[in-house]
């Protein structure tokens, strides 16, 4: 068996799932994948590795490698390593990213570049998969091309590797096809099953007959346009190439609960310390007629060891919506068993390599707890999940549609009706009523419910033992009922939690409602980042934060104000804030507080943009619609701050549009004011980022 080392670096499980898919496909191509997380350094050794290396690397934050790869990246960036340290190593790398972020696929690019600097060579070209348009558009063909690339690599080494009898038989059965085709076309033997309506085999013969019958009957769908449940030609008449079904590997037993005192998990598992803290204050920062509702919450951290500084972020551990969990269990016909304990075991005869129990499902927890606190039931189902669901769908039309949505031919429909529409499992089960998946399938495919990150919006110097954060209540259209809106998993939960004592925005600075009933939430620290005030207090800084992106900068300003009080003779650099919102009178967050900082001189320049109002007349506000416009209105000062005064620029907020537009504006500013072309301006920004003088805290 031809062995290769397969490493993944994952943040939320995406890279791991893709690596597992590669591992499962490897056997059918005569390869053996030695699969490990890159953090499991005790299980592999690149210094002595003789086989080819395949890596799948995701990206997190603002272009950083995932947390699981931090140690690995640090080790390979040791400056004492010689340039031929990995000269023996041949590798192929698949990077995952999102082009909505400035530093697309940077986690993979960092590792790729460093491996080459240390002498490693590609046996297969690097792939960059974009979650913005659909990872599968690159992932699937990259995996398809991996097998001929590995085959070519092993042939170039000469000789045949040892194989077991079963492996030899497997290869022999493939020999006619292999010999009849060029090596670069061998990927046709990959994991896909060619499901032709003319040649589907005995198991699907009844479905084929039903499909033929359905063609001659009136459609039960009024809308003849393509939709989640309905396809149109040519897709509806095409033969389909669909993924091979992933081997099931879990056995699930439901054990009747012995009573409420029975020992079970009360907190979802986490590698980070978890703190239970009360919400001491909740303030609505926007007016009732604002397009988005923004809340400020204050946490009382006086009883826990939770240190933080302005610019830090932290995680809120949140549950799924109780009503959604109830609806899902009802649809799965498990509502009467929601208090039962879930016992998991690995199937004795599973074909899944390296099968293990999901670490995010605590042993002996109730069914309701698992679906409420452990599983991301809002996750958009991947194609492998759709493929598995199709096997448990009895209606021929519904089964065919699920197969279309996970097929190569149905990629456009998948993106439009599943991915872009943020369809979740409950949506699918309500749309395809004959789909009756077993519980083990859901536990195998639903990912871990992730904590939600929030920026600290306060300074411990001004608010000791308190922690502020700000968020918009996210509203999403529901795919199950046309008129309803779903709230964000975490923001909707928090809004409901604080509704009984939510205060209007009268005076954020001094209002205190700690005497109200204080619900408690779970929080955990996040890995430290560099989004902090510079150590050199005399360095000028530019802060760009529209909407809730202003949150960390309020903490910056609070911190700076207290430092100036403590050091009245200190040399403090200028502070610019570029803030933006829709309406001056509806969603101008922290308006009075920002004006206070401007009046006291802590904030040197406040430039505010109102995208939906007529041009403002007040002196501190420039007539620009967006923060990037305001930056360009002050291009000379911005360029001087960054290029001549060794200043810092911080950008916080939406990655999809704002962060890109701000980046483009900075390129134009540097190009114009420094008299260089745009390529040189981009290099200058890259240098600023490397020097940690251009810092981003952005989200999608």
UniProtKB/Swiss-Prot annotation:
UniProt: NADP(+) binding residues: 292, 611-612, 626-628, 661
Protein location: Cytoplasm
Modified sites of kind Phosphoserine: 173, 190
PROSITE patterns assigned: FAD_FR, FLAVODOXIN_LIKE
Assembly description: Forms a multiprotein complex with MMACHC, MMADHC and MTR.
Role noted for this protein: Key enzyme in methionine and folate homeostasis responsible for the reactivation of methionine synthase (MTR/MS) activity by catalyzing the reductive methylation of MTR-bound cob(II)alamin. Cobalamin (vitamin B12) forms a complex with MTR to serve as an intermediary in methyl transfer reactions that cycles between MTR-bound methylcob(III)alamin and MTR bound-cob(I)alamin forms, and occasional oxidative escape of the cob(I)alamin intermediate during the catalytic cycle leads to the inactive cob(II)alamin species.
Domain spans labelled Flavodoxin-like: 4-147
Additional notes on this entry: It is debated whether the reduction of free aquacob(II)alamin occurs spontaneously or is enzyme catalyzed.
Cellular-component GO terms for this entry: cytosol
TM region positions: none
Family matches, as InterPro entries: CysJ-like_FAD-binding (IPR003097), FAD-bd_FR_type (IPR017927), Flavdoxin-like (IPR001094), Flavodoxin/NO_synth (IPR008254), Flavoprot_Pyr_Nucl_cyt_Rdtase (IPR001709), Flavoprotein-like_sf (IPR029039), FNR_nucleotide-bd (IPR039261), NADPH_Cyt_P450_Rdtase_alpha (IPR023173)
This protein's name: Methionine synthase reductase
Source organism of this protein record: Rattus norvegicus (Rat)
Annotated keywords: Amino-acid biosynthesis, Cytoplasm, FAD, Flavoprotein, FMN, Methionine biosynthesis, NADP, Oxidoreductase, Phosphoprotein, S-adenosyl-L-methionine
E.C. number: 1.16.1.8
Superkingdom as given in the UniProt entry: Eukaryota
